Amino acid sequence: MTSTSQLFDPYAEALMAIAREQGLEDRFGEDAALFRSTLAASADLRHLLENPTLFSSQKKAVLNQVFGSSVHPLVLNFLNLLVDRNRIAFLDGIADRYQALLRKLRNVVRADVSSAVPLTEAQVQVITEKVKQLTGAAGVEIESQVDADLLGGVIIKVGSQVLDASLRGQLKRISISLAA
Protein backbone atom coordinates (compact mmCIF):
# COMPACT_ATOMS: atom_id res chain seq x y z
CA MET A 1 0.00 0.00 0.00
CA THR A 2 1.31 3.43 -0.94
CA SER A 3 1.36 6.10 1.73
CA THR A 4 0.12 9.55 0.85
CA SER A 5 3.56 11.05 1.37
CA GLN A 6 4.89 8.73 -1.34
CA LEU A 7 2.28 10.23 -3.66
CA PHE A 8 2.73 13.86 -2.60
CA ASP A 9 6.48 14.10 -2.06
CA PRO A 10 7.78 13.53 -5.60
CA TYR A 11 5.45 16.15 -7.04
CA ALA A 12 6.08 18.66 -4.26
CA GLU A 13 9.83 18.12 -4.56
CA ALA A 14 9.68 18.53 -8.34
CA LEU A 15 7.76 21.77 -7.95
CA MET A 16 10.31 22.96 -5.40
CA ALA A 17 13.16 22.10 -7.78
CA ILE A 18 11.57 24.20 -10.52
CA ALA A 19 10.93 27.02 -8.06
CA ARG A 20 14.54 27.00 -6.87
CA GLU A 21 15.88 26.99 -10.44
CA GLN A 22 13.79 30.05 -11.20
CA GLY A 23 14.18 31.76 -7.81
CA LEU A 24 10.41 31.60 -7.33
CA GLU A 25 10.11 29.58 -4.12
CA ASP A 26 7.99 32.17 -2.31
CA ARG A 27 5.80 32.90 -5.34
CA PHE A 28 5.07 29.20 -5.77
CA GLY A 29 4.36 29.05 -2.02
CA GLU A 30 1.77 31.79 -2.44
CA ASP A 31 0.25 29.83 -5.32
CA ALA A 32 0.15 26.69 -3.17
CA ALA A 33 -1.63 28.64 -0.43
CA LEU A 34 -4.12 29.87 -3.03
CA PHE A 35 -4.84 26.28 -4.13
CA ARG A 36 -5.38 25.15 -0.58
CA SER A 37 -7.70 28.01 0.34
CA THR A 38 -9.65 27.71 -2.91
CA LEU A 39 -10.09 23.96 -2.53
CA ALA A 40 -11.11 24.40 1.11
CA ALA A 41 -13.70 27.00 0.14
CA SER A 42 -15.14 25.17 -2.87
CA ALA A 43 -16.39 21.63 -2.48
CA ASP A 44 -17.69 21.86 -6.05
CA LEU A 45 -14.21 22.48 -7.41
CA ARG A 46 -12.80 19.60 -5.37
CA HIS A 47 -15.49 17.24 -6.64
CA LEU A 48 -14.99 18.38 -10.21
CA LEU A 49 -11.24 17.76 -10.08
CA GLU A 50 -11.76 14.36 -8.47
CA ASN A 51 -14.44 13.32 -10.98
CA PRO A 52 -13.01 10.45 -13.06
CA THR A 53 -15.67 10.82 -15.76
CA LEU A 54 -14.50 14.29 -16.83
CA PHE A 55 -11.98 14.53 -19.62
CA SER A 56 -8.55 15.96 -18.88
CA SER A 57 -9.25 18.82 -21.28
CA GLN A 58 -12.32 19.79 -19.23
CA LYS A 59 -10.37 19.77 -15.98
CA LYS A 60 -7.57 21.82 -17.55
CA ALA A 61 -10.08 24.35 -18.83
CA VAL A 62 -11.55 24.73 -15.34
CA LEU A 63 -8.11 25.07 -13.76
CA ASN A 64 -7.15 27.67 -16.33
CA GLN A 65 -10.35 29.58 -15.68
CA VAL A 66 -10.01 29.43 -11.89
CA PHE A 67 -6.25 29.88 -11.50
CA GLY A 68 -4.93 30.99 -14.90
CA SER A 69 -4.56 34.69 -14.17
CA SER A 70 -3.63 34.20 -10.51
CA VAL A 71 -0.76 31.72 -10.58
CA HIS A 72 2.63 31.70 -12.25
CA PRO A 73 2.58 30.10 -15.74
CA LEU A 74 5.00 27.38 -14.60
CA VAL A 75 2.62 26.49 -11.79
CA LEU A 76 -0.27 26.34 -14.26
CA ASN A 77 1.83 23.95 -16.37
CA PHE A 78 2.39 21.89 -13.23
CA LEU A 79 -1.37 21.72 -12.64
CA ASN A 80 -1.85 20.51 -16.20
CA LEU A 81 0.79 17.84 -15.61
CA LEU A 82 -1.12 16.68 -12.53
CA VAL A 83 -4.25 16.39 -14.66
CA ASP A 84 -2.37 14.42 -17.33
CA ARG A 85 -0.99 12.04 -14.70
CA ASN A 86 -4.37 11.65 -12.96
CA ARG A 87 -2.95 13.21 -9.80
CA ILE A 88 -4.95 16.44 -9.68
CA ALA A 89 -7.11 15.01 -6.88
CA PHE A 90 -3.96 15.16 -4.74
CA LEU A 91 -3.43 18.88 -5.31
CA ASP A 92 -4.22 19.87 -1.73
CA GLY A 93 -1.76 17.35 -0.30
CA ILE A 94 0.93 18.27 -2.82
CA ALA A 95 0.47 21.98 -2.07
CA ASP A 96 0.61 21.27 1.67
CA ARG A 97 3.82 19.30 1.22
CA TYR A 98 5.31 22.07 -0.94
CA GLN A 99 4.58 24.57 1.81
CA ALA A 100 6.28 22.27 4.33
CA LEU A 101 9.35 22.09 2.09
CA LEU A 102 9.34 25.87 1.78
CA ARG A 103 9.13 26.27 5.57
CA LYS A 104 12.08 23.91 5.95
CA LEU A 105 14.06 25.83 3.33
CA ARG A 106 13.33 29.13 5.09
CA ASN A 107 13.83 27.69 8.63
CA VAL A 108 10.24 28.52 9.51
CA VAL A 109 8.09 26.38 11.80
CA ARG A 110 4.34 26.12 11.90
CA ALA A 111 2.68 26.53 15.27
CA ASP A 112 -0.93 25.44 15.73
CA VAL A 113 -2.34 27.52 18.57
CA SER A 114 -5.65 26.84 20.27
CA SER A 115 -6.99 29.50 22.61
CA ALA A 116 -10.18 30.07 24.56
CA VAL A 117 -10.68 33.47 22.92
CA PRO A 118 -9.27 35.04 19.75
CA LEU A 119 -5.65 36.09 20.17
CA THR A 120 -4.65 39.73 20.06
CA GLU A 121 -1.78 40.86 17.87
CA ALA A 122 0.36 41.33 20.99
CA GLN A 123 -0.37 37.76 22.12
CA VAL A 124 0.53 36.42 18.68
CA GLN A 125 3.85 38.29 18.89
CA VAL A 126 4.61 36.85 22.33
CA ILE A 127 3.79 33.32 21.14
CA THR A 128 5.87 33.83 18.01
CA GLU A 129 8.91 34.91 20.02
CA LYS A 130 8.46 32.04 22.50
CA VAL A 131 8.25 29.48 19.68
CA LYS A 132 11.35 30.98 18.04
CA GLN A 133 13.22 30.63 21.34
CA LEU A 134 12.10 27.05 21.84
CA THR A 135 12.79 25.88 18.29
CA GLY A 136 15.61 28.11 17.09
CA ALA A 137 13.58 28.83 13.95
CA ALA A 138 14.05 32.01 11.95
CA GLY A 139 10.31 32.47 11.60
CA VAL A 140 6.98 31.13 12.79
CA GLU A 141 3.69 30.65 10.96
CA ILE A 142 0.84 30.78 13.45
CA GLU A 143 -2.35 28.87 12.70
CA SER A 144 -4.82 29.80 15.41
CA GLN A 145 -8.22 28.48 16.31
CA VAL A 146 -10.60 29.23 19.14
CA ASP A 147 -11.55 26.39 21.49
CA ALA A 148 -13.88 27.61 24.23
CA ASP A 149 -13.41 24.31 26.09
CA LEU A 150 -9.92 25.46 27.11
CA LEU A 151 -11.50 27.95 29.55
CA GLY A 152 -8.39 30.15 29.30
CA GLY A 153 -4.77 30.10 28.15
CA VAL A 154 -3.39 28.41 25.05
CA ILE A 155 -2.19 25.10 23.66
CA ILE A 156 0.70 25.40 21.22
CA LYS A 157 1.67 22.53 18.91
CA VAL A 158 4.89 22.68 16.92
CA GLY A 159 5.52 19.44 15.10
CA SER A 160 5.21 16.69 17.68
CA GLN A 161 5.81 19.02 20.64
CA VAL A 162 2.84 20.30 22.63
CA LEU A 163 2.93 23.10 25.17
CA ASP A 164 -0.29 23.09 27.18
CA ALA A 165 -0.66 26.39 29.00
CA SER A 166 -4.45 26.17 29.10
CA LEU A 167 -6.59 26.44 32.19
CA ARG A 168 -8.20 23.12 31.28
CA GLY A 169 -4.76 21.49 31.15
CA GLN A 170 -3.75 23.00 34.47
CA LEU A 171 -6.96 21.77 36.10
CA LYS A 172 -6.39 18.31 34.66
CA ARG A 173 -2.83 18.22 36.04
CA ILE A 174 -4.06 19.36 39.48
CA SER A 175 -6.76 16.69 39.42
CA ILE A 176 -4.20 14.00 38.58
CA SER A 177 -1.83 15.13 41.33
CA LEU A 178 -4.66 15.20 43.90
CA ALA A 179 -5.77 11.72 42.88
CA ALA A 180 -2.26 10.32 43.31
Curated annotation (Swiss-Prot):
Record's keyword terms, sorted: ATP synthesis, CF(1), Hydrogen ion transport, Ion transport, Membrane, Thylakoid, Transport
GO molecular function: proton-transporting ATP synthase activity, rotational mechanism
Localization terms from the record: Cellular thylakoid membrane
GO cellular component: plasma membrane-derived thylakoid membrane; proton-transporting ATP synthase complex
Topology within the bilayer: Peripheral membrane protein
Any matching Pfam family: OSCP
SUPFAM superfamilies: N-terminal domain of the delta subunit of the F1F0-ATP synthase (SSF47928)
Function: F(1)F(0) ATP synthase produces ATP from ADP in the presence of a proton or sodium gradient. F-type ATPases consist of two structural domains, F(1) containing the extramembraneous catalytic core and F(0) containing the membrane proton channel, linked together by a central stalk and a peripheral stalk. During catalysis, ATP synthesis in the catalytic domain of F(1) is coupled via a rotary mechanism of the central stalk subunits to proton translocation.
Subunit comment: F-type ATPases have 2 components, F(1) - the catalytic core - and F(0) - the membrane proton channel. F(1) has five subunits: alpha(3), beta(3), gamma(1), delta(1), epsilon(1). CF(0) has four main subunits: a(1), b(1), b'(1) and c(10-14). The alpha and beta chains form an alternating ring which encloses part of the gamma chain. F(1) is attached to F(0) by a central stalk formed by the gamma and epsilon chains, while a peripheral stalk is formed by the delta, b and b' chains.
UniProt record similarity statement: Belongs to the ATPase delta chain family.
Name of this chain's protein: ATP synthase subunit delta
UniProt organism field: Synechococcus elongatus (strain ATCC 33912 / PCC 7942 / FACHB-805) (Anacystis nidulans R2)
Lineage: Bacteria, Bacillati, Cyanobacteriota, Cyanophyceae, Synechococcales
